[in-house]
Amino acid sequence: MAIASTELVEREIRIDAPPSVVFEFLTDPAKMVRWMGTEAVLEPWPGGRYCVNPTGHEPASGKVLEIIPDRRLVFSWGWEGGALPLPPGQSTVEIALEPDGDGTRLRLTHRDLPPDMHSFHGLGWDYALPRLAVVAAGGDPGPDPVRSITRSTLMAARSLPPRYLYRLGRQRLRTRTSGRPQR
């Protein structure tokens, strides 16, 4: 079993939608797959199942640990299938929503990741959260190229140096919508 690290993946983003709308995109499976994944199962109560399949090959799954409507969602996270060294439920994702004017400030903390999985998950959230912001604000985030990642590509990405993953992630973020650079 991989050893968890004390380092955190932390992200923050402002979304031009009220917390109630953002919360729906975090907890309604039909809305969730509009910004992340090919399929999702989410039982929005403590102990309920949390499962999202970003690529169509290796679902991430865990349990809902805490849920406060329109304010907070905490769930365990890990990958089924063994392609990544993070079994289901081994790490924890905490999402806090705060009103910010007419929008929402979303703060995400992903903890208990093995050291070799920080960059991978950091880039994953760097990719997914802007897509959430677009769809929650009523926009179309466009096609999701992550859905076309093969299992072998997923395994190979694990071994890339963090600086390469960072550059790759920044390039994808800059070109994610309508051809205009997004920074």
Where are these regions (language model features)?
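Short, solvent-exposed secondary-structure boundary/capping segments
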Residues: 71-78
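Short beta-edge strand/loop motif at the mouth of beta-sheet-based domains
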Residues: 10-11, 17, 21, 30-63, ...
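Short, highly charged C-terminal tails/helix-capping segments
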Residues: 134-174
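Hydrophobic/aromatic beta-strand elements that line small-molecule binding cavities or substrate pockets
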Residues: 13, 61-66, 91-98
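Hydrophobic pocket/interface hotspot
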Residues: 22, 32, 50, 64, ...
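A short, structured loop/turn motif at beta-sheet edges
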Residues: 19-20, 65-71, 96-105
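Hydrophobic ligand-binding cavity/cleft-lining segments
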Residues: 1-39, 158-163, 170-176, 183
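Beta-strand/loop substructures that line and gate deep hydrophobic ligand-binding cavities in soluble
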Residues: 8, 82-129, 143-144, 162
